[in-house]
């Protein structure tokens, strides 16, 4: 929790104490008392504050500048926080080691549904997290429109391990800006439903689309929502049946839940974190160095010129589901302290300073 948050709570408690001293107690109707308790609890959990608007955030970034120096101490400290809260080295994906036969687990996105690991699911898991840890130099690539005409493709592809979000297009028209290399790509079940009709009639189209990701891991939240399990399993079987180069990993719901709690404790209150923040969180726990690209959820770039929402289209997300400005401010803070590097300018215009 931020110092400001603590101060607000202490102030509000002090104010209530003063009011209690000045005014005699009165008996309230039971319904009114219950309502007061609910309101006070809500304000305690979610203290009232005003998030800066888009223009204020952009102006703040411009004033602070994007100059950056790696801070190994800050990076190690945050990696330790990730290890302590969420253990990505062991819990990033479902494995035979962390999800043994017969284990009962809860969907992290639903409170009413659980599932039990049986032979049909256990056989789909790798023995352990299939990465040689720690990963050295990682690039996490979001899909923000700020990547368009960025010239960042070569810099992204220089990373040892590249993570991408939501099966993004990597055709030749984009590679100069976003690169072509991938080691891990996320795929939300909603994409499988909407773009590939749940793989009921378009298995070949799906397999052909996956070829662009070469030997990547396809990381899917099969056990976040009950409705996501079936399409995720279909992806596994489809790629397995044709001997595709890609390997499906299922996100561990305990890991996703822990990441959600971690960021909620730091002020991000959203129905669900974005895929990008989940990936950055994992990278900060798995990688020695982290650089992120395309994490800019605003309608203008650093020169206050209009940009599209994604580098490949301008389709806006559903309002209120993610807390993108809050997420950005948290990542921007990590950039400023040197724990990760956030690329916001054209790559050829950026000169990195040496490690401190």
Curated annotation (Swiss-Prot):
Uppermost EC category: transferase
Localisation per UniProt entry: Golgi apparatus membrane
Pathway: Protein modification; protein glycosylation; Lipid metabolism; sphingolipid metabolism
Lumenal domain ranges by topology: 49-356
Key words, A-Z: Disulfide bond, Glycoprotein, Glycosyltransferase, Golgi apparatus, Lipid biosynthesis, Lipid metabolism, Membrane, Signal-anchor, Sphingolipid metabolism, Transferase, Transmembrane, Transmembrane helix
GO cellular component: Golgi membrane
Similarity comment: Belongs to the glycosyltransferase 29 family.
Function noted in UniProt: Catalyzes the addition of sialic acid in alpha 2,8-linkage to the sialic acid moiety of the ganglioside GM3 to form ganglioside GD3; gangliosides are a subfamily of complex glycosphingolipds that contain one or more residues of sialic acid. Can catalyze the addition of a second alpha-2,8- sialic acid to GD3 to form GT3. Can use GM1b, GD1a and GT1b as acceptor substrates to synthesize GD1c, GT1a and GQ1b respectively.
Protein name (record): Alpha-N-acetylneuraminide alpha-2,8-sialyltransferase
Organism this protein belongs to: Pan troglodytes (Chimpanzee)
